[in-house]
Amino acid sequence: ALPSLRGKEKGMMHRDISINQKEIRRMEDTMTATVLNEAEVICATTIGCGHRLLESRKFPIVLMDEATQASEPSSLVPIVKGCRQLILVGDHQQLPPTVISRKAESGGLNRSLFERLIACGLDSMMLTTQYRMHPVLREFPSARFYENRLEDGCTPDQRPPPAGFLWPDWDHPMAFIPVAGAEEVDEEGKSRSNRDEAAKVLGIVDALLAMGDITADGIGVVAPYNGQVRLLSQLFDEAGGREAGQPYGGLEIKSVDGYQGREKDVIVFSTVRANDAGEVGFLSDYRRLNVAITRAKRGLIVLGHPTTLRHDPNWRAYLDWAEERGLFAWHMTNQ
């Protein structure tokens, strides 16, 4: 053991350890290089393409998935490594890159290369067939955000609404539940929550699980504010827990931004905002609305304060669409 060694013996031991560590690193680098040399495709994040293990490698073909989530500087990392053909896949009608700094965001860092190229008029190809949503759930986003170009790759029979929730129309598995509660601002004034909506979300999930037509891992709970995500997480943890083997095991509670690219059989969306001034905050970003209402496969349940939400034109259009089809779940308001 090193502590028992003295003088020259200790120095020699340190030298041997250093030599062995260098040899281990050399062997690891050799094995990694061998794997990379034999690989026809290398998968990495945009920033990961700048790792030292890839610094001498060229990528003549770059395929960037979720390209609208990548900032322009990060997109350049793989492109400058010998790219001759660039394929960008993404949806500029959904959320842009996440930028923490407001100053950087206002300076344009939240604009993706994908969005810039579209704005410049570069020819693009749109994949128009969606395989996720019940056809009814596709209707509004297609009309509002995609010029009515979306088509369905699944039928209503393949996306039956789950039992356990009294849908206003069983042929239209979408429901808007008016909630009269008020939003709360956290102590730091940086996030918001809504206890009335959170309590209703818990009741809705309990009812869905009680019928056995869906399991907890098939349900996604979504909110626009981290304050509401924390409140919901606390409620479900206190009610039994979300770990494996617990009553809500597998239930995911995330922000809208955290659900981009994800899907669940049922999405329960708590909109949080409820105030006399009609302020909706960053719910006013139509891309956030688009992401939230396009995650569900079999059913979508939205909770919110209609008077507040109608101050925003996109939310007003969405609520009008739901109301015209009789999808306001007034029977759930007082439960």
Stretches with model-predicted labels:
Residues 47-335:
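Conserved helicase motor core of SF1/SF2 NTP-dependent helicases
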